[in-house]
Swiss-Prot record:
Primary location group: cytoplasm
Assigned protein family: Belongs to the protein kinase superfamily. Ser/Thr protein kinase family.
Protein name as annotated: Serine/threonine-protein kinase ATG1a
Biased composition (Basic and acidic residues): 330-339
Organism: Arabidopsis thaliana (Mouse-ear cress)
One of the record's GO molecular function terms: ATP binding
Amino acid sequence: MESARLVGDYALGPRIGSGSFAVVWLAKHRSSGLEVAVKEIDKKLLSPKVRDNLLKEISILSTIDHPNIIRFYEAIETGDRIFLVLEYCSGGDLAGYINRHGKVPEAVAKHFMRQLALGLQVLQEKHFIHRDLKPQNLLLSSKEVTPLLKIGDFGFARSLTPESMAETFCGSPLYMAPEIIRNQKYDAKADLWSAGAILFQLVTGKPPFDGNNHIQLFHNIVRDTELKFPEDTRNEIHPDCVDLCRSLLRRNPIERLTFREFFNHMFLREPRQIPDVEHSGFSTCTGKSLLPSAQPSTSTNRFKSSAENVHKHGSSSSASNSQISMPHTSFEKTRKDTEGQCSSNQSGVVDSLELIEREYVLVNRPSASLEGSSDCFDTSLQDSGFPNILPRNEKVSSSSLEAQKPLSDVSGPRPASVSYLLTEVQRLTIVHPPTKLQLLHQYAQALTELASEMGNTGQVKESFAVTLVVLAVWRKALEICDSWMMSVGENEVNPDPTTAPETSIPDLNSPAPAKTWVTQEFVTALNQAENLSTQLNETSAATHMPDAMETIYERALAYGKSGGAEEYLSNKESAATLYKKAILLLSFIIEEAVTLSLNPSFSLTPDDKKRILYYISNLQHRRSHL
């Protein structure tokens, strides 16, 4: 009997796939017996472009360790071959699954889309776009009804900073975004279009667009008509699913859902549990990730760099130079310090607001309905100077929110209502850039005031760290202006940076004046950062820099505590102002900070998000009853 072919430590078995440039083999590790997929690539078939794509795939996969991304073990190079050793998925791909099952139940579609969203979240955090998302590239861990889904085949993927736009024509025609077909510049939202096409196919059994040939297919994708669901499925599909499909398959990428909105869409949400004040995990110290020590979700458990994994050549993605570099603390040290404090006295930054709630906020609190929380949140936005994001004649009805109530007899404010409303804010602002710009202005204004307070009290390093976040906020606003101008076809505006900033928000009915105003605000923040940097240099403050997000979080807690004290002393106006500041900063952390281009990147664990939503809900509840 002929012995198995050996590649490194792996014995190759049967062929399980093939393509234009590669053959895929099922293989086993000779020592551990681990089954893997080995992609064999003939170097002679590689053009320089294809070789570059291959190196990108190695580079991307070597930096990611996530259950919804295909796992990369190593690359082995011989004289005429390159072998990629990858995780083996016995369930085949999603295309085969759809061929076997046809349209799937909505629960199964929801399962797969949640898995896809989790994988895309990792790519988005790393500023990668896949560019070829399709059922054939979504692998399944087993042949179960609801297996684990993993994103694979990164040959077309590329690193993309939030400001940059790709121009390469690539991807599968059935799942290709209109902006790619039109040969326009595109960004990571092209992946969201593909995700929408995949969801549509899951729940209907067929892609959203077809044609007799590529020309007809492309015409059907780019023409401005409403997405149509097959007659036999219209009454079967939940409105949330229909909304997600339509929101992802918007031809104008500006109107398409953002990644944040996609991850938080109602269709993908898990059933929520209402925290119990006395028995919630928030009120105990478990030693798990807490906000000050929360690490970016992709910063730990990574595989070795490609320089270590590729035997003869390495490849690694260069860090983006477009990010705002943030001074930061040692997360590991902070985590240990925090854990050491928790077990004894429940003190420290993380638990301080919890103690505030017990002392000031949660005393004899009356029951609050979701509708009440909705009104409270809307009122807070108006009081803060926000635009009327939920107009009175379009306010979400109590009946539509009724489905969000897990329990009708639970007293106290509900975090679910705040999360729902914040998501509605995000969903509406994508269609209205002026509203989003004003929201960013509110965050920038609050952070600028915080930086000023700290600078006035001699906390120059903290002030500098927060000012860098302000710069990141205005940079995002500039990106929105650029995209807005592109969508309406306005010419580029190059405002004079020496022009004095506007003292108030201008009329934002068109992108040109909006960009002028945003640029002026950015320059103002940049000048402030330079002044603070000069102060630091003059004082030789080359010491450890504080973490900006911890600083913002701590100050939000302090505002909440002070507001509770003022409420206790019946100083209602002062209490309302302090509560409002705390709510705004906490809302910034949970809704906007995680989307900014910061270095190091900032992320929250699910527990952190729930905790902060709970704080926001309680603070809103107290403020509404002053």
